[in-house]
Amino acid sequence: DTRDGMVRTYREMIRTVSEMGEVVAAEGIDCGFVQGGTVVAATRAGQVPRLKASIDLANRAGFGESDLRWLEPAEAARHVAPSRLFGASFTPHCAAVDPARLVLGLAAAVERRGVVVYERTPGRIVPGGVWTPAGMIRADRVVQAVEAYRTQLPGQRRRVIPVYSLMVMTAPIPATMWGQVGLGARETFSDGRHLIIYGQRTADDRMAFGGRGAPYHYGSAI
């Protein structure tokens, strides 16, 4: 059923994180990959029951403490130290990474194995594959890895809603300040608010921080 499918999908997502780390190491891809887990901090008292409820839901789906657990404030502060901290949830199944360098490294790895990567090739999804000016590519499955930009493809404008995510990044932060902030294992982080935020400590000691506060633009405009 739908629930079982969701659980299988989540377990596959967990497996993918470790597998990606193995590939990065085997191929020598310099992308700052560190699997330090992710911590979701409760920075308001009202966020505590919401985060604990998400842990209970995971437990009922068959995930244990090794997958997702609650941290009391003192333990949570060893991961990240915001000005207010009422506890946090923590999962080890997450990694910090530079996505652009990861993609370029993966492309180079498959090219070394004889795969041809075609760039700057316009394509249009049609039944049974992808049409290009140079010919038809036939495939049983087509992965539309274009995120919100799918709305700019012919016939796709109303099939997805583009959701924006804006990011900022600091200059390199000195070690003395990181001692106050935390993230010593390069944990990724968020908090329990309804608005999605996220961040990570980069390989060169910057803080990369983002959120989903940007508005939807009328007509699925980009």
Please provide the spans of the model-predicted regions:
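Dinucleotide-binding Rossmann-like beta1-alpha1 core, especially the glycine-rich loop
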Residues: 1-73
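Helix-loop-beta segment of a Rossmann-like dinucleotide-binding subdomain
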Residues: 3, 30-40, 75-105, 109, ...
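Active-site substrate-recognition segment that forms the wall
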Residues: 18, 26-34, 124, 135-176, ...
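Conserved beta-strand scaffold positions in the cores of enzyme catalytic domains, especially
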Residues: 38, 68-70, 88, 117, ...
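Flavin (FAD/FMN) cofactor-binding core of flavoprotein oxidoreductases
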Residues: 45, 74, 78, 222
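Helical element adjacent to the flavin cofactor pocket in flavoenzyme catalytic cores
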Residues: 49, 56-61, 83-141, 145
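N-terminal FAD-binding dinucleotide-binding subdomain shared by FAD-dependent oxidases/monooxygenases
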Residues: 54-61, 68-76, 84, 97, ...
